[in-house]
Amino acid sequence: VNNVIIRRATLDDVHAITQMHADYSAYANTLQLPYPTEKTWEARLGANDPLVTQFVATLDNVVVGLLVVHQPAQIRRRHVASFGITVSQAFQGKGIGSELMQVMVDYCDNWLNVHRIELEVFAANGSGLGLYEKFGFKQEGILRDYAFRDGQYVDAIVMSRIKSKS
């Protein structure tokens, strides 16, 4: 999708982010509970946690995606980051996830000095697995019965990307 702008998320984005996460497809592949409130997102965006960076993807000034990058508090794991991505259902499959991934990789590699980016993805999330593999993530293992979703336990796959030495 052309004309996508990726920028830091602000408190002005709370309503749009809440609306995006009100859709089943937005939270089904995350560990978020359904029906988040604006207060929940306001607290997250207003926390000013130096180890958490949040970006939004906008198209024609409408928020269509969210990227959250986390760094661990443990000093000996500061070379690691994890992340979460959400794309509005109407814009899934249009390259916005790839644009957010590119921003995340650049941010981690060139600004945070991150050596290892790690994630957990539900085993049934084929589009997520494909996206992460496209960006060089490798599967490391399976977390059996990792989360409870839609009335059943589901597995997750652990993946990571180690920054190349070049």
Label the model's feature ranges.
Residues K94, S98, N110, A123-G141:
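Conserved active-site alpha-helix within GNAT-family acetyltransferase domains
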Residues F122-L129, D145-S166:
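C-terminal "cap" of GNAT-fold acetyltransferases
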Residues R8-L11, Y24-A90, M101-Q102, Y107, ...:
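Acetyl-CoA-dependent GNAT
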Residues V4-Q19:
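A short beta-loop-alpha structural element at the N-terminal edge
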Residues D109-E120:
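Conserved GNAT acetyl-CoA-binding A-motif
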